[in-house]
A protein has these predicted regions:
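Juxtamembrane boundary at the C-terminal end of a transmembrane helix
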Residues: 77, 81, 162-168
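Hydrophobic, well-ordered secondary-structure scaffolds
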Residues: 154-164
């Protein structure tokens, strides 16, 4: 719990903190988007039907891999390719910082682990709701549940990404 609080307070402190937070948030969002899209398109095997009945193996795997390759590619563009105007975006993402510190392969696994943490947060929230016998954590957002339903995947992803970020 303390780690979650630190990871949410730290980004406000300085611009690199905001970049960290923005990057972690994007990893989590892209993981959700790609897992959902490819799960609906290609999904045949359900992985946890009792916890999250619509999660498929295909969606989960592509939800993990595509953001990992996408962010690695963005990091490559920021470091290796000089495109006018692209340096503005590198200020918002800390991926190039990871690549400089760890190299491409380790950075790939950091993003992959962060994506896995995102999916774990979603599954943890789903399991909690099943245990409580509710569909959503609230009804603030019609059709989407409560605020916690919107950020469940970020709850674990951001602290995990923060651990790697703090080691740089």
């Amino acid at each position: 719990m303390i780690l979650i609080n630190i990871s949410l307070i730290f980004p406000i402190a300085n611009s690199s903190g905001r970049s960290f937070f923005f990057t972690a948030l994007l990893i989590s969002v892209f993981t959700d988007i790609f897992a959902l899209a490819f799960g609906k398109l290609l999904g045949k095997r359900f992985i946890y039907p009792s916890i999250s009945p619509n999660k498929t193996l295909e969606g989960t795997l592509l939800g993990l891999l595509i953001p990992s390759f996408l962010f690695l590619f963005l990091g490559y563009l920021f470091i290796e390719v000089e495109i006018i105007g692209l340096e503005v975006f590198s200020e918002f993402l800390v991926i190039s910082l990871f690549i400089d510190s760890y190299g491409y392969l380790i950075t790939f696994f950091i993003i992959l682990i962060s994506s896995l943490a995102s999916i774990s947060g979603d599954l943890l929230a789903s399991k909690s709701k099943r245990l409580m016998g509710i569909k959503d954590f609230g009804n603030l957002l019609p059709g989407h549940g409560g605020v916690l339903d919107r950020i469940d995947s970020h709850i674990i992803c951001i602290p995990v990404f923060f651990i790697f970020y703090s080691l740089i």
